């Protein structure tokens, strides 16, 4: 059913065969043309003194990985790592370096918000992480310089209340910093933080969550808020914080590990008809519910995927599958093509479920969502994008999805892996 948030899904479900028109020969030209469109739309690059002012050349470096050109650099890096695009690898990496170097200059000149120095998706930590990846992919030994700056940010986010708005969520808080470290560990095949650093960050997250839950008299052990709101979803909420604690659970004391699992089960109990409200205690309105990566089942699914991969308990996989069913029904979102609250973000749930189950039904569903992105219905009925190049709201994240659709055994939501 068509609603104000989503298009009606009129596709037939899986009947035993994948779409013939979604092979490499068909999709690769779409990827290439979309990349070229993104690169043509990029704003002028600056950095340093040129970055002053919202309309200056350096404004392109604002917004971090989420909406700035740093996110485009990551997309180009991601494409360069695919054997399917080996011929363009060097060009894409060189372009990525140019973009991320502008962002590095903006960071080094102090033109960015001091509160986002250690932010993964909105600030410095993400810039340094992607610079490390791009430099390393180019074979440059000086990749250790941005890596060293990333490591140094551990001291910034170690104090329990280092941000007034909330110190623990994914975009600007400690969960994001741990997530960035996880990405670097995966791509560099080495742990980039010391055990002492990891334990310090995890302990700060735990202490913060315990203190908040006690202060607010919650009937569960860990809770957090961001700008005063008790979010549950992946963008700013409990689910991604718990996901990061599970990702580093070997660094937790057994008693704290138990608190994390209790909180995971508490969140599972908050499910309302295959979905979760944006904030704790809300009742979902079925005709107006959010089915986004940022708020709702398509993002919370990743926590339960991680819980399943660690524990092998079927209730966690069953929860992921229910998330996928709702996403199939309501995931053709009108907000655009992106991964935060768009069609590609919905489709990534199917690629996740394929990796968890091996069921080709989920590749088919992802193919259908990819197909829908290029229909006139979507183009005319979706929201006009503020930035077509944004990694999270625009087409850069969509490119990552299309690449991953061609290599589903390695597919994972950008910068948010549960398989590390």
Swiss-Prot record:
Identify the Gene3D superfamilies for this entry: 1.50.10.10
For this protein, the record's InterPro entries field holds: 6hp_glycosidase-like_sf, LANC-like, LanC-like_prot_euk
* Cited Pfam families: LANC_like (PF05147)
Top-level lineage group: Eukaryota
Give the record's GO biological process terms. Answer: carbohydrate metabolic process; peptide modification
The text of the family note is:
Belongs to the LanC-like protein family.
Entry protein name: LanC-like protein 3
Q: Which gene encodes it?
A: Lancl3
């Amino acid at each position: 059913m068509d609603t104000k948030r989503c298009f009606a899904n009129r596709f037939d479900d899986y009947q035993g065969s994948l779409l013939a028109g979604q092979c490499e020969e068909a999709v690769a030209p779409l990827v290439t043309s979309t990349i070229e469109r993104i690169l043509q739309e990029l704003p002028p690059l600056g950095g340093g003194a040129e970055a002053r002012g919202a309309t200056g050349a350096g404004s392109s470096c604002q917004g971090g990985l989420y909406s700035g050109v740093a996110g485009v650099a990551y997309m180009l890096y991601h494409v360069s790592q695919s054997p399917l695009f080996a011929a363009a690898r060097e060009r894409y990496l060189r372009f990525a370096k140019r973009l991320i170097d502008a962002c590095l200059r903006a960071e080094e000149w102090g033109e960015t918000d001091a509160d986002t120095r250690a932010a993964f998706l909105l600030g410095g930590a993400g810039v340094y992480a992607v610079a490390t990846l791009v430099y390393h992919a180019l074979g440059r030994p000086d990749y250790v310089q941005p890596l060293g700056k990333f490591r140094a940010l551990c001291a910034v986010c170690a104090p329990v209340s280092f941000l007034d708005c909330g110190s623990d969520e994914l975009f600007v808080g400690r969960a994001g910093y741990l997530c960035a470290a996880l990405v670097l560990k995966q791509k560099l095949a080495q742990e980039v933080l010391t055990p002492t650093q990891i334990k310090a960050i995890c302990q700060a997250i735990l202490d913060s969550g315990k203190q908040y839950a006690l202060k607010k008299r919650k009937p569960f052990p860990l809770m957090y808020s961001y700008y005063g709101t008790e979010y549950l979803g992946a963008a700013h909420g409990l689910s991604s914080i718990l996901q990061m604690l599970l990702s580093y659970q070997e660094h937790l004391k057994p008693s704290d590990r138990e608190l994390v699992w209790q909180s995971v089960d508490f969140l599972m109990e908050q499910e309302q008809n295959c979905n979760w409200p944006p904030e704790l205690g809300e009742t979902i309105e079925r005709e107006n519910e959010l089915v986004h990566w940022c708020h709702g089942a398509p993002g919370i699914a990743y926590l339960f995927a991680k819980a399943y991969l660690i524990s092998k308990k079927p209730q966690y996989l069953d929860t992921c599958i229910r998330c996928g069913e709702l996403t199939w029904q309501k995931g053709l979102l009108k907000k655009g093509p992106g991964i935060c609250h768009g069609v590609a973000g919905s489709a990534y749930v199917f690629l996740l479920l394929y990796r968890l189950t091996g069921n080709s039904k989920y590749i088919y569903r992802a193919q259908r969502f990819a197909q829908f992105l290029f229909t006139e219905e979507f183009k005319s009925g979706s929201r006009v994008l503020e930035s077509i190049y944004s990694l999270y709201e625009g087409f850069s994240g969509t490119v990552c999805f299309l690449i991953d659709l061609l290599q589903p055994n390695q597919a994972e939501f950008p910068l948010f892996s549960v398989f590390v």
